[in-house]
Amino acid sequence: MGFNVFVTRLLPPEGMEMLRAACATVDVFPHDRPPTKQEIIRAVKGKKRDGLLCLLCDPIDRDVVDALGSTIKGIADYAVGYNNIDVARATELGIPVSNTPGVLTHATADLAWALLFAAARRIVESDKFTRAGRFLGWAPMLHRGADVTGATLGVVGAGRIGAAFALKSKGFNMRVLYHDPSRNEALEKELSAKRVDLDTLLRESDFVSLHVPLVPETRHLINAEKLALMKPTACLINTSRGPVVDEAALVEALKNKKIAGAGLDVYENEPALAPGLAELDNVVMVAHIGSATTSTRAKMAQMAAADLIARMKGDRPQNCVNPEVYEKKHRT
């Protein structure tokens, strides 16, 4: 087969091997950093690409989609969220876009719990303290954190990841509140979870974990006004998308002890951090590693490759995020 594909970063071998077996040409961006928009355009424009496999940090905007040319048959995003792609423009041009849902659900939910515990029990702060040689022996007031067992857990977004995160609370005897446009009967049955409005959730929760997609309605969903509703003992966890939180407002809330702590996997202007964030002891930060387990990343690579190959062969990708392209005449 003579398929011609561009991949914006070297993926785990499980996915790369699938692409190389199915394609005549698989070009990979050679640097271990996100390519710029112009670098992506140069890699695809006039190159007669059949497929593009990109990452969540790649800016696949209108200009990039237009540069793909008439030969492009599909775009595969190595992520569950696809706000980095101008899906509307791809749909106009009849280009199916796929993502990798489901496979990273538990890895991301697990990381949210890791951040919750790290923030609640001040683990990173205590680790630094110990490494610095400041630990002089057990002390009754040293690094006291918050109880998790028996606390109130607020889950904002009860889709795949949010629901999995909530269900993992079962062993901690927590009261669970959730906020979502749709009712989640499984959470209500398994956890006696209560669906509430966002303000109620923020006021009553000891831990608030965000699991919403980034759409116009969720940008700065958590702003200064919403942070002011939270308990001064509460912690905010974000493993969704950075712009869901007004990061400058979060810095002020943490600095002024309006909330007790935060655990962040994502950032508003990733990879840049809001001024002052890195200097705070009451925030735990990791480098967008929600799906970063060996097996999860391998499965994501296989899923993205399989959908791209299917589309190039003329089949419908399993995880198409713009199925409306199949209501029109599109490239085959």
Please report, for each region that a protein language model flagged, where it lies by residue.
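Rossmann-like dinucleotide-binding domain for NAD(H)/NADP(H)
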Residues: V97, T233-T332
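Short glycine-/small-residue-rich Rossmann-like dinucleotide-binding loops
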Residues: L56-C57, V80, D206, V212-L214, ...
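An N-terminal-biased, well-structured beta-alpha scaffold segment characteristic
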Residues: M1-S98, N223, K329
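Rossmann-like dinucleotide/phosphate-binding beta-alpha-beta segment
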Residues: A21, W138-P232
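A short, aliphatic-rich alpha-helical micro-motif
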Residues: V44-K47, V65, G69, V148, ...
